[in-house]
Amino acid sequence: MSVRIAIIGDLNPSSASHQELEAARAVLGPDVETVWIGTTDPRIDRLAEMGIDGVWLAPGSPYADDAAVLRAIRWAREHGIPFLGTCGGLQYAVIEFSRTVLGWHATHAEVDGVGATNAVAPLACS
């Protein structure tokens, strides 16, 4: 039985994190298939049809299509699909949960500017 994992993010070959993700893909073995999906790629809205078993939202925010990223996170959460968000991926998961579950008008300081509705503050790592 193989597992199919979507790695969602805007691939940047000069990013150390993205280079390591690519290296990890090479050693996962035949039972794990990974599919890199850019945030502007229409496949981001067809994860169920693609038979995706897990979602890894890669570092690299802000993303080219924030709305598509939030839709993918919501799909994974609502369908019980394992989800891992690293760096910006986790930050966007906080935004998605705050908006759709808590009903907050949550924003991200690095995308929307510092304000009273920030669920994610400016971070030193960014």
List where the protein language model places each region.
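N-terminal beta1-alpha1 cap of cysteine-dependent amidohydrolase-like domains
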Residues: 1-126
